[in-house]
């Protein structure tokens, strides 16, 4: 059995026991998080009906926070002396999927 869950602006395929990275969630390590379900596949049965998915839930345990790779942004305008350098590092939360229920 696996499910497609929405975490932030992304959708990810998860099964019980998977460790995934989602956009940062303000919860402490060890707490439980419920992720919204988009689709559930159980063997040959595919559930995508909105009424049935309202009852479905994916529970995950927060393992901790991580950071993504450093991204460097550079801007340059010729002949004007304009230069700009900026960096960004996205924060993620690692979670372990503990239960998928319909």
From Swiss-Prot:
| Cysteine pairings via disulfide bonds | none
The protein's matches in InterPro entries, at most eight in alphabetical order, are given as: bL21-like, bL21-like_sf, Ribosomal_bL21, Ribosomal_bL21_CS
Q: Give the record's GO biological process terms.
A: translation
GO cellular component, alphabetical, reads: cytoplasm; ribonucleoprotein complex; ribosome
Keyword match Nucleus: no
Pfam families from the UniProt entry: Ribosomal_L21p (PF00829)
> Is Lipid metabolism given among the entry's keywords?
no
Q: Which domain of life is it from?
A: Bacteria
The UniProt keywords, alphabetically, are: Ribonucleoprotein, Ribosomal protein, RNA-binding, rRNA-binding
Q: Name one GO molecular function term.
A: structural constituent of ribosome
**Cited function:** This protein binds to 23S rRNA in the presence of protein L20.
Subunit composition and interactions: Part of the 50S ribosomal subunit. Contacts protein L20.
Return the similarity comment: Belongs to the bacterial ribosomal protein bL21 family.
The name this protein carries in UniProt is Large ribosomal subunit protein bL21
């Amino acid at each position: 059995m696996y499910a497609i869950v929405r975490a932030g602006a992304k959708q990810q395929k998860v099964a019980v026991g998977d460790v995934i990275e989602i956009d940062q969630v303000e919860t402490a390590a060890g707490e439980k998080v419920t992720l919204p379900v988009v689709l559930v596949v159980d063997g040959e049965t595919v559930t995508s009906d909105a009424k049935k998915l309202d009852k479905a839930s994916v529970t995950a345990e927060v393992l901790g926070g991580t950071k993504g790779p450093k991204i460097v942004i550079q801007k340059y305008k010729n002949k004007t002396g304009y230069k700009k350098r900026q960096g960004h590092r996205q924060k993620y939360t690692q979670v372990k999927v503990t239960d998928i229920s319909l």
